Structures are given as structure tokens and as C-alpha cells.
């Protein structure tokens, strides 16, 4: 069904292209929203675009969308993206433990006695928690591995497709568009869920998940010169009252409120020639990392 809808929309867009012939083919910008594990549905969308031979000139992503978008922009084939995502131990990204196989015997004994380490520290002025429950070391390892083929690229305009990742300045609340530097660090900043992962310091700014400021960065694609925007929105729906039961669900609900509000603002920027896609992901959550094949298909 999604393929048929996209085909119809693209045919309508292609029919309008002769009107722009004097200035050349219109630039197509692909915008991928955040959404945790549901971001793997973006890969299914990429597969459809690839099958339909839709040209993509600009890729912009927030949070999970930045991870998928970065790989696609770096020139990785969709099939390889799928394989990499299935192989990766995404659940380990929510731990800083590098795995028992890599630990000395002494650490293994400590872990057996003290299986949970909340990252609490003590200083002269009192008891302190870290910037997030998770420092993000394992997430960094995963992203380094995923982007190893583009590790030497510092200007994201030099990737196979120009790319931007969107993060949020924790001090000001402003969106930060990252277009240069280390690709894995840019993704890491864009995916730094507040309170879960420690913020990332990049170019002197303290950055967290881009979904806080701009979860569906249509405006960024327009600023980069996109004439046609294909926006894929997998923003979480708000929880029902009966599903808000503990602290994590409360925090999650507040985060969803913020992302939905800024997403609605971005949706108003879409023009008639733009395409909005909202894959039907009912029954799946932002934590369903083991459902990669199903998410690929639903995308």
C-alpha cells in the first residue's frame, strides 16, 4: 500500500518537473525523523526509493533518522544498511558495559557482586549523578563501526549525498545543524536522549537529541535548497492515561509532547509538491530493536 501511494505521489511530482526544466531538475531532499528503534522503518522507505530510482540530493536526519540517513548519504547500499542493522547489538547501546568477554577477571568478579552501576559520584560538595544514566561508550563504538567507511570525511557535503544531522543545544534549546566533523560523533549528538545518554560536547556546545528542538527537520532541507521534500515521520503518539504508570513513562510522555509540537510546526512548512510519509507502526515501540526485519517491511 505504501509503495503504491509513494509511486502515485512521485508520478505527480515527476509530471510537474517539465515546468522547472529551464532551471534543471529540482533538488529532492529526504528528511528522516527521530523515533528510536522505529527509525529502522526508514530503511524500508529507502528501499522503495531505490526500487523506484528516485534521485535524492540532500539527506537530513534527527536522532534515529540521522543514523539511517548518514549511512545512506555515505553511499551505503540499502541491503547493506539492513544487514548492518540486523547484526548490530543495539540493546548494548543502552549500557556502558563493554561485555564480559573484554573484561579482566577482577572486573568480572566485581560485576557479579555489583551487577548495576548507576554512575553515581561523590565530590566535596555532595552526591552527583552523571549527565545521563548512560555515558554512551557502547553507542559510540556501534556508530564508529557503522560509519567506518566515512571516517575520514570531515565535510558532510563531500559524502555521496550531502548530509546534515540535527541536535539540540542543551543550554539554549536551539536546534544545531551539524554538517562537518566526525560523522559518528554527529550522529551520537543527534541521538543523545536527555537523561538517558550523557550530552555530547561538540564545537564548544553541549548537545542532546535533536528531537527536542526539531524532530522532522523540513526547514533544514529547505535551507539546503531542496525543491521537493520527502519527509518520513515516525514520531511517537502520546500515551493513553492507563499507560503512564512510572517515572520512565512520564519522562517519555513529556519528551513526546515536545517532539510532537515541533513536528507539527515543521509539517506546516510542507508545500503541495512535497511528500509526507507516515508508516503504520502500530504495535511497535521505540524500544523494539529486535524487530528490525518487521520494521524494514513496514517502512
What are these model-predicted stretches?
Residues 5-18:
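Bacterial N-terminal signal peptides
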Residues 2, 21-62, 70-298:
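Patatin-like phospholipase
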Amino acid at each position: 500500500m505504501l509503495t503504491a501511494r509513494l509511486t502515485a505521489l512521485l508520478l505527480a511530482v515527476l509530471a510537474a518537473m517539465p515546468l522547472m526544466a529551464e532551471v534543471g531538475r529540482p533538488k529532492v531532499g529526504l528528511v528522516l525523523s527521530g523515533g528510536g528503534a522505529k527509525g529502522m522503518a526508514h530503511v524500508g522507505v529507502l528501499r522503495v526509493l531505490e526500487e523506484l530510482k528516485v534521485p535524492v540530493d540532500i539527506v537530513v536526519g534527527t536522532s534515529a533518522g540521522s543514523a539511517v540517513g548518514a549511512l545512506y548519504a555515505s553511499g551505503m547500499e540499502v541491503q547493506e544498511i539492513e544487514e548492518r542493522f540486523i547484526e548490530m547489538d543495539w540493546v548494548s547501546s543502552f549500557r556502558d558495559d563493554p561485555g564480559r568477554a573484554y573484561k579482566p577477571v577482577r572486573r568480572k568478579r566485581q560485576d557479579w557482586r555489583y551487577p548495576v552501576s548507576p554512575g553515581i559520584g561523590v565530590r566535596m560538595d555532595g552526591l552527583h549523578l552523571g549527565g545521563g544514566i548512560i555515558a554512551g561508550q557502547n553507542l559510540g563504538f556501534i556508530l564508529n563501526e557503522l560509519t567506518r567507511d566515512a571516517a575520514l570525511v570531515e565535510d558532510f557535503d563531500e559524502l555521496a549525498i550531502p548530509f546534515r544531522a540535527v541536535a539540540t543545544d542543551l543550554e539554549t534549546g536551539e536546534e544545531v545543524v551539524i554538517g562537518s566533523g566526525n560523522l559518528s560523533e554527529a550522529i551520537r549528538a543527534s541521538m543523545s536522549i536527555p537523561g538517558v545518554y550523557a550530552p555530547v560536547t561538540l564545537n564548544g556546545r553541549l548537545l542532546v537529541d535533536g528531537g527536542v528542538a526539531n524532530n522532522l527537520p523540513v526547514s533544514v532541507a529547505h535551507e539546503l535548497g531542496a525543491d521537493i521534500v520527502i519527509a518520513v515521520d515516525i514520531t511517537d503518539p502520546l500515551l493513553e492515561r492507563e499507560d503512564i504508570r512510572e517515572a520512565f513513562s512520564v519522562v517519555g510522555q513529556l519528551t513526546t509532547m515536545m517532539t510532537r509540537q515541533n513536528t507539527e510546526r515543521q509539517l506546516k512548512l510542507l508545500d503541495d509538491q512535497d511528500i509526507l510519509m507516515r508508516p503504520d507502526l502500530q504495535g511497535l515501540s521505540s524500544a523494539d530493536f529486535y524487530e528490525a526485519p518487521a520494521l524494514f517491511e513496514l517502512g
